[in-house]
């Protein structure tokens, strides 16, 4: 691969990275899946073989893509083959949330299996692209995309404070028959204050939190202080349980690696305590409205999540043993958590493989400061998905997976010092 072609690949991703976090805008409004990032992802499957001529990293790219597709097809075909022979099995879809809710009778090769597979293909294409071609100079464009998303979110919140109406003029994505907006305008009332929950161009506040959490963590570990502070503020403005649980998980991970005396841990704890002491009544109402009511099932969101989880787990327990192992097929159901969604769709095999995909780099990467950031990002993403965000198709997830896998074979090249609690120095 000559220099010119390598430059084309670099520039291709730099443009892609800027729009990668955006999910509520469609280039072609009446065609689902035509977000700018998805178009870049799917086109890359054609562009890379042409530019690399199946040599070098291009060969590795094709190998990784085909390997993933092979595993995916095998798992689903095995599951579908069993279902086609088990003529006595007639699942009751009335208790679970199926993606294609117009069809409650088809068991084998449901339409949603194929439509959802296209989204997964875009996600995997992103993963193998970044895994094989990532360069550190891409980071500036990765952060640029995250900051643009955050700036637009701040604009929306400010617009609502001034004019008391939705200021989103970009989102155009819809679901179902076109009557359900892909961008949910939500407010939260805390005392006499009414705030719009920051969502930007991701659809809803929890999805913004899910998208931006790994960028925030990675910015800290790249020592991008201003960017990490800005993203932290936007995460707080989501008033999303996903954001707060993610922050708590990251704090615990920092304590695990760097101890309680770590400057960032101390800073977060001290700032949190000061804010709580100065605004105790406000904080009490805030925590009650955003976390406690949901966890205690006192609001509609918490009740719905708990019921869907239990319904999907009951549905899974009543499946034939072989189907419990290999699942009903990818894209059949979508609960409010990835754990029960994975078990129903792809069984124990799918759950185990998905878990290994995330934790292999967590155990393989050495403990450089940057690598610890990638590990923390993957852990936060994984548990956020399992608990509250059953969303596999957000490309930010696959971006950070690709970066982590890319760093495994060359972990001792750019960052050749293994940092520990005793010798890690963190600049303020």
Residue ranges of model-derived segments:
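Hydrophobic transmembrane alpha-helices and their immediate junctions
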Residues: 223-225, 248-255, 262-266, 346-386
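N-terminal hydrophobic segments of proteins, predominantly signal-anchor/transmembrane helices
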Residues: 9-28, 45-122, 381-384
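TM-adjacent membrane-interface loops and short helices in multi-pass inner/ER membrane proteins
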Residues: 300-334, 348-351
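Interfacial loop-to-transmembrane-helix boundary motif in multi-pass membrane proteins
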Residues: 9, 61-73, 121, 125-172
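Membrane-interfacial helix-loop-helix modules of multi-pass inner-membrane proteins that assemble, modify
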Residues: 83-101, 151-201
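Transmembrane alpha-helices of multi-pass inner-membrane enzymes
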Residues: 18, 45, 377-384, 391-428
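Alpha-helical transmembrane segments of multi-pass inner-membrane proteins
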Residues: 120-125, 139-163, 190-239, 245-256
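Flexible juxtamembrane loops connecting transmembrane helices in multi-pass membrane enzymes
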Residues: 276-310
